[in-house]
């Protein structure tokens, strides 16, 4: 999905990647 235009911190990126893998 499209991510909002915000500054994501490493923790946010890691969380997103994990969510994508779960999907």
Curated annotation (Swiss-Prot):
GO terms for biological process: killing of cells of another organism; lipid catabolic process. This is Phospholipase A1 verutoxin-1. Keywords: Allergen, Cytolysis, Disulfide bond, Hemolysis, Hydrolase, Lipid degradation, Lipid metabolism, Secreted. It comes from Vespa velutina (Asian yellow-legged hornet). GO terms for molecular function: lysophospholipase activity; phospholipase A1 activity. One of its GO terms (cellular component) is extracellular region. Activity is maximal in the presence of calcium. However, unlike phospholipases A2 whose catalytic activity is strictly calcium-dependent, this enzyme shows considerable catalytic activity on phosphatidylcholine emulsified in calcium free solution; the catalytic activity of VT-1 assayed in the absence of calcium ions is 18-20% of that assayed in solution containing calcium ions. Contains six disulfide bonds. Belongs to the AB hydrolase superfamily. Lipase family. Its EC number is 3.1.1.32, 3.1.1.5. It is found in: Secreted. Pathway: Phospholipid metabolism. Expressed by the venom gland. Is about 7.7% of the total proteins in the venom. It catalyses: a 1,2-diacyl-sn-glycero-3-phosphocholine + H2O = a 2-acyl-sn-glycero-3-phosphocholine + a fatty acid + H(+); 1-(9Z-octadecenoyl)-2-hexadecanoyl-sn-glycero-3-phosphocholine + H2O = 2-hexadecanoyl-sn-glycero-3-phosphocholine + (9Z)-octadecenoate + H(+); a 1-acyl-sn-glycero-3-phosphocholine + H2O = sn-glycerol 3-phosphocholine + a fatty acid + H(+). It is an enzyme of class 3 (hydrolase). Catalyzes the hydrolysis of glycerophospholipids such as phosphatidylcholine (1,2-diacyl-sn-glycero-3-phosphocholine) and has a moderate activity to hydrolyze lysoglycerophospholipids such as lysophosphatidylcholine (1-acyl-sn-glycero-3-phosphocholine), but is unable to hydrolyze sphingomyelin. Liberates the fatty acid from the sn-1 position of 1,2-diacyl-sn-glycero-3-phosphocholine mainly, indicating phospholipase activity of the A1 type. In addition to acting as an allergen, it possesses a moderate hemolytic activity on red blood cells of mice (3% of hemolysis at 3.0 ug/ml).
